[in-house]
Amino acid sequence: MGKSKKEKQQAYFFDNKALLALILPLVVEQLLAVLVGMADSIMIASVGEAAVSGVSLVDQIMVLLINAFSALATGGAVVAGQFLGQDRREEACKSATQMVWFITICAIGITVLVYLGKSFILHTVFGKIDQDVMHHADIYLLIVAASIPFMALYNGGAAIFRTMGNSKVTMQISIIMNVINIGGNAILIYGFHRGTEGVAIPTLVSRMTAAIIIIALLCDEKRTLHIERTWRYRINWEMVKKILSIGVPNGLENSMFQLGKIIVLSLVSTFGTYAIAANAVSNAIALFQILPGMAITLAITPVISRCVGAGDYEQAKYYNKKLMLITYVSMTAMVLFIFSLLPFILKAYNLSDLTAKTTADIIHFHGIGAIFIWPVAFSLPATFRAAGDAKACMYISSISMWIFRIGFSYVLGKYMGMGVFGIWVAMVIDWVFRAMCFVIRYFKGSWKKNAIV
């Protein structure tokens, strides 16, 4: 006798209600991050241009570190998720504990290196900058560097909660963190006139608070995944190697992506003030266009890793198809919504006619690319990583970025005279190449041969 429809639905790891409960808080979390980032920028601007520049320089390093910790956290999440798929809860908890300890030790080591190399970072990495900018960067780095271990702990903890299918907790902690950050900024900048310190201190306090809350919650043994309550940590190299097999390729991919953005930004600056402004505004608006996709991509890891752990690739394909469809629908809705608001958004920025026209062209072009290409170029590889196929993602993404995103930016933007618009065209060409490679790999089934537990 075949299974009834109800029995088949019960065999699925995530029903529609569970998927919705996983995705919606992630969308809210991503939206908060973008909105708070914008509010942060406005508050910092009130301190002065030198403060904006100094904070921005240090934040570029912080973004690199956040990417590295997120990659390690993803590695731990994939390992724990695959163990859960095999109903090996004890091993899943051990992998979560190993990831949290390992990521913390790495973060403490990086923090020590940042403090020891502070002078090198300020004078060599940042190059020749004005003394005023250097002063603000120095103050900000001195305070914010202390938040590195807490930032790592939060990233690790958030990944574990998502693996359990519980993104509501991370959303709630994110709200607390952002309230502390924005509230602290407002009080210290506008109330006590602390300048750059007023920006840095709330960042440190909010990250400390988030880390303490998430680790306290993870020590609850009633949870599906929890960490051991002990200060005696013994490294399990076999487990750590599994985590690193995902974390290292993913981290290198993220870091190179960030490096590519910096290289392209240096090219944009050669096109003049209007191009810099158009690019900055376009980046801010474009982030909203892909926001649902970024949230759903985070949801893919716990869902697919559970299926792969169980050896159920049919279910993995089912969820991949379902989540990709949700990504396409939600991104289409968001892009069309942004298109409808674009005239009002551009008016609010008070741009010159040339800058406004260039920005509108970029946003329309980016939006169309986001609807048709972005999900396959960025959400589909999340399925591969969850299946243990992180190296292939790294190779494809790195080759595509250097040849198309960076190489074609110079060809189209500089040599063919397309300016800043050419850089965005090059970016979408990069998406097309990635999408083609990932679709071919998906249908060939190569990604199914890399389960790590």
Question: Language-model segments: what does each one mean?
Answer:
Residues 31, 35-53, 122-131, 187-194, ...:
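Helix-terminus/linker motif at the lipid-water interface of multi-pass membrane proteins
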Residues 21-40, 143, 206-210, 214, ...:
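Transmembrane helical elements of multi-pass membrane transporters/channels
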Residues 1-25, 80-147, 180, 191-248, ...:
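Short alpha-helical transmembrane segments in multi-pass integral membrane proteins
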Residues 73, 143-162, 170-181, 199-214, ...:
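Short runs within selected transmembrane alpha-helices of multi-pass transporters and secretion channels
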Residues 52-112, 151-170, 265, 276-342, ...:
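Small-residue-rich hydrophobic transmembrane alpha-helices
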Residues 21, 44-63, 131-136, 196-197, ...:
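Interfacial/gating helices of multi-pass transporter permease domains
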Residues 26, 30, 41-42, 78, ...:
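Transmembrane alpha-helix boundary and packing residues in multipass membrane permease domains
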Residues 11-42, 46-47, 63-75, 79, ...:
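N-terminal transmembrane alpha-helices
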